[in-house]
């Protein structure tokens, strides 16, 4: 966004009059939340989709699955049929009943656009959806699929839109009439580049929000967002650590009692994906050298202010089935130089390397408005220059970076694992489709067909020991191929003003428990 546009947004926000406590909770996000189609992806923002739409079952912080729009379920002995009993008395916010017919209509709409969801293995495995009674729904799979319940709990696509709000012919692939769900919030106004306003759903079946309105102001710049919290323009910062600069978080967190803050347990892994199908990172020696050349301990200490622990592998060993007993590549600049020397990448008089007249140069792509990614990229650029690799930094809009991830126009590019409940199964599943950077990063590997076949076997494995064995083999192959540079284990942060109470972390990185928050003056047992 230009400085002039940023100023215009700031003026509009500064002139806004905040209502009395208890009426409005004000948050911010870098972009508008999008049209909020529950069955599609960007520009729809996941935290907002999860505020309006609900799943059959919900993921808990302890890794278990709890009833939600379904109160109970059974699984057939062969693992192929799931029978759900739906919660009675639930309606969509437009008054349409939530029943088995509505559930089937949503599954039909999702499966009519099955190719768009091929990254998620459950959509491949669903054979049919059936109405088994007014409040009884049956899902029949082609084969057993261990992560079925966890994938049904994801923020998208298996959430429920009022059938009355679907597009022509009951479809959603080309758009919806309105974002109408069963959740605690309703999207009531969007002002492009300014804000999105949600109203509490008065017919919500669960615990009612304590605030009448949730306003999400569009603030692209992390520094501006930190200032907005400090001045009282917004009440809450919540999300990945890059929402505000880490030094601003540490400063604001210590301003009690006016402001309070917290850091979550590690939720995901921040990585760079290295493109094995594009020179010069098609050379395994170059990928290994990059892994050995980055001083992650210094990076974590100086750029991330120690908020995120160093990552050595794609998944933390605490992730289910992910402790593969691997040895970290480890920071060793001398070893990185030897790898490049032995691979024929010779230094020139300027200290940079080349082979056969081709310079050892690579592009590193990052979200331009993400100050944290930019700072990390600059450290990596400097570390790689020390071993003779020239890095050109490219900062672009998030949508452009997502497009690069999908089509492979990158040398190095930022990414993250997705945290619970995606990791590891759903994240691994997505590696088989060109929907994220992982497919493109792996595409040049000779063993790519074997990698994809192993992922398919992992998802079908009913025996936990066999699934763990297969996962360990897969993670070993990816680690040895060096197509990822793990950087740190990403955390969520929250900072809120003293007028807000009940702020806590959700079970996943992409869902914000706004409905649990309340004015500090309210009783805790409200």
Residues of each region from the PLM?
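Detector for C-terminal structural segments
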Residues: 24-25, 191-194, 200, 293-327, ...
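Aromatic- and charge-enriched surface segment that lines or borders ligand/interaction sites
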Residues: 72-116, 138-140, 228, 280-282
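Alpha-helical secondary-structure segments
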Residues: 99-106, 136-140, 183-184, 211-213, ...
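Gly/Pro-rich hinge or "lid" segments in bacterial periplasmic/extracellular proteins
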Residues: 153-209, 213, 333-338, 342, ...
